[in-house]
Amino acid sequence: MSSPPPAAAAAMAVDDADDDQLASMSTEDIVRATRLLDNETRVLKDELQRTNLEVESYKEKIKENQEKIKLNKQLPYLVGNIVEILEMNPEDEAEEDGANIDLDSQRKGKCVVLKTSTRQTIFLPVIGLVDPEKLKPGDLVGVNKDSYLILDTLPSEYDSRVKAMEVDEKPTEDYNDIGGLEKQIQELVEAIVLPMTHKDRFQKLGIRPPKGVLLYGPPGTGKTLMARACAAQTNATFLKLAGPQLVQMFIGDGAKLVRDAFQLAKEKSPCIIFIDEIDAIGTKRFDSEVSGDREVQRTMLELLNQLDGFSSDERIKVIAATNRADILDPALMRSGRLDRKIEFPHPSEEARARILQIHSRKMNVNPDVNFEELARSTDDFNGAQLKAVCVEAGMLALRRDATEVTHEDFNEGIIQVQAKKKSSLNYYA
């Protein structure tokens, strides 16, 4: 048989000792000991009853306080901003007996300086219902209208125009929809997509990926299409800005839009910001007496700061597109901001044939159509004009009530687009 554990053995030894003691005690001693035990039991029962009553009273107080909190938390709140969070550490001073003590001055812990939407600046020694560790300067909070106690934290405030920049629906374009730009696709993927999907490969080599990419080239060569395809291939948030959208009437409004856009991108990182027609704000700086020009320059300076300032974030990538790279400011073009410049030239003959095939793949095309010959006939055409050729060919087939598009339709479409390309339009007021 195994021996009992030490605790059980000790308990058995105590019981044996008690039995021996009881056997040696007289009847009067046993009666006296029983009375003492009864008294102790009665005292413990009274203490238990008193403790239960205290617990019940505390529960009632908690319930009352929760009701008061519910009353205080009734909407609407007053909106305020945290200006500063302070640590309260009062010096211990010997107080005389009977001296009045200022409780606020003796508080320890965190307190807050608050600025409300009514333009009041308020010091709060007691923060309220929000954990002080979760607060930071600049946070938006809801406070009580009378006591100014912080009742709840509110989501960050962004300009409604910036919220509208977020692309909710993923673009449907694919890299297969882009013809003749294989080198440009590879450069864009290396600079934008790979740092987001394979960050460890850059860390192993010890290199920092580019912060931004500039797509430049003549109009209609596929710059915006490439950016949309890039957005479709990544799971990142995609913000689309237009350069003219950042030029605002009021001073500081354009810079605030840029700031808010990057702040929203930081919150929703990883994120890609696409700025189309960046030449609207990124032109070379010059001395001007016109306040509008200076405001445009201020907007560009804010963009430079966000790209390469103290608050820049590696999880935010910028794609900028322009067809006038020659007028952009050198500070915007320097390395460290828009590191990689990708040129989009007019498509070559092989690329033109591929673009015509891409745009006509959903059309009912006659098998005799020779795209290589059509590509030779479309010298100096860009991608947009080649798409127009396919549309014109389809319209001509529709005019003939044909069921398929022939080679002659494409030839006629080329002639029509070429005529529009060469004709000069004059507008008169």
Curated annotation (Swiss-Prot):
Keyword set includes DNA-binding: no
Region (Disordered): 1-21
Binding positions for ATP per the UniProt entry: G217, P218, P219, G220, T221, G222, K223, T224
Subcellular location: Cytoplasm; Nucleus
One GO process term, biological-process aspect: proteasome-mediated ubiquitin-dependent protein catabolic process
Highest taxon of the lineage: Eukaryota
Pfam family, one: AAA
InterPro entries hit by this protein: 26S_Proteasome_ATPase (IPR050221), AAA+_ATPase (IPR003593), AAA_lid_3 (IPR041569), ATPase_AAA_core (IPR003959), ATPase_AAA_CS (IPR003960), NA-bd_OB-fold (IPR012340), P-loop_NTPase (IPR027417), Prot_ATP_ID_OB_2nd (IPR032501)
Signal peptide: none
Gene Ontology cellular component annotations, sorted alphabetically: cytoplasm; nucleus; proteasome regulatory particle, base subcomplex
Record keywords: ATP-binding, Cytoplasm, Nucleotide-binding, Nucleus, Proteasome
Main location, first listed in the record: cytoplasm
Main function: The 26S proteasome is involved in the ATP-dependent degradation of ubiquitinated proteins. The regulatory (or ATPase) complex confers ATP dependency and substrate specificity to the 26S complex.
Family the UniProt entry places it in: Belongs to the AAA ATPase family.
Protein name: 26S proteasome regulatory subunit 6A homolog
